[in-house]
Amino acid sequence: EQKTVLPLLEQLSQETGIPLVATNDAHYLTKEEAEMQQVLLCIQTGKTLDDPTALRFETEEFYLKSTQEMQTLFAAMPEAIANTKRIADRCHVELETGTLHLPAFSMEGVSDNIAFFQALCEKGMQKRYGTPVPEPVRNRLQRETQVIQQMGYVDYFLIVWDYVRYAKQHGIPVGPGRGSGAGSLCAYCMGITEIDPMAYHLLFERFLNPERVSMPDFDIDFCVEGRPAVKEYVIQKYGADRVTEIITFDFFKARGAIRDVGRVLHLPYAFCDQIAKKIDPRQTIAETLAAPDGKALQQLLHTNADAKKLLDLAQKIEGVPRHTSTHAAGVIISAIPLLEMVPLQKNEDTIVTQYPMGDLETLGFLKFDFLGLRNLTIIRNCVRMIQETEPHFSIHHIPITDAAVYQMMANGDTMGVFQFESAGMRHVLLQMQPKCLEDLTAALSLYRPGPRDSIPQYLENRKHPDSISYAHPLLKPILEVTYGCMVYQEQVMEICRSLAGYSYGRADVVRRAMSKKKQEVMEQERQTFLYGLDGVCSGAIQNGVPKAVAESIFDEISRFAAYAFNKSHAVRLCLSGISKNRQNTLWNFYTGLKPETIQSKRLEKRSVRMKEPATHT
């Protein structure tokens, strides 16, 4: 077809005077990837390679050709090649980085945002703590406001404060705080969060500090039915061209790639599934083949042609984006029209960025998390039912020290309570017999891969606190609250600070590196932890910690940091759990879990939830 069309295009160019341009219709990078492209087409369309009706390219020429190849192909039309180069030379894109595209907060009657921010914090501090304000609280607030102003995030706090205020004013339930943002005293005083960071020893530096590389973000929970209204408020305030949701990419992983390629090759599912299960889900196909445990798979590769074909093609598509979706909560609010710097597309009924969050952050765009939480909807429904007989009831009237609530938790009566309803967690609660919020926070943080192995030790230490021994006396004030066990990310930071002299900011950077298991960074940090670093910290040995003890402690925090839980987030989950488990509202609570509310297809699980209140009548 091209051989027929090209002479006609050349003739049309001569007749109209419109210059010719040589183009390269490229769908893949190299000629060798033609088969991979066909496999991807078949996966996308649900076809097999041997299906005569499958969409396919007729040649293997749809790859990105070199300059020499293009010049050879268009040897008879050198002016077309020259025109292509002229266009390319005129294309020049520089994406600015290092500038924060955060809109300036505006509100009628507010002319100085910094002064307004400080006034909100001061007024909120007096409301939360009374007068005179305790000195540690005032000092903490002063430190936080200085960091926030220094790093240029005053408008960020005000923007979040504004849409949280809007939600509360319009009767949309808002969560008490999620993630590291709950560690901010400023956020608590402004009413963004409802968790007192002073009472629960939460660290602001876990959320924001001058040494932090990545941008902070508040994760705010809204009633799932009210979330669209809050987002619409933001769109109306800042402009539809400056507010958008964020794309996410789902990539082919090893096991999924094997199963998908197997379908395309028309191989038996059982055969493909057997091979897929030989791949360690934490590894790539190549890593599994190179590992000692991969010898059986290597042998199959050399003796079975179907297996070789399957794995060869699966490795080619492994790591390739499979499809796109929309970030569950993230929203960009920009100071400039987004199309000036960001390509956009439509995902179903939503406009989203074509850049994922990491690239958006590099370009200076901040993410605001609007999470739709069905549990808040359930709590709202319960409150409305309670108010039919107790008109003045408020969720904020539930004391977090209510012994009856903790007794229910200790009895394992937590069906339908988010994060506490699994059989394993109920078993932990029965063993632990929680008496306070700190107990629930520890239970929630321990019951996850990694720390779960520490549960028996934690329970034993809790029974016999006098028998707990610490590797070094400096660990006692940090780990005493969790009976000698490391439970929270914040404890990792405190250990680095107390033993080795780290700043909180530096300690958070180290925690992040450990959580990502960056071996080179961790080995470098080991030396810093032990021996210190000029201008950074003194090191544990200089602070009087024996070398062997310091090495042992660093090894322990390195292992633990990969699985450690954020205490700020754990406290928020526990407060929500307490709100949902108030003893004298059981019937209302379980009625709030009615099928149309939870939208569950698991009928047998739903019936358990609906029957359980009968045991408390």
Regions found by a protein language model. Give the residues of each.
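Alpha-helical scaffold/interaction cores of sigma-54-like transcription cofactors
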Residues: E1-T617
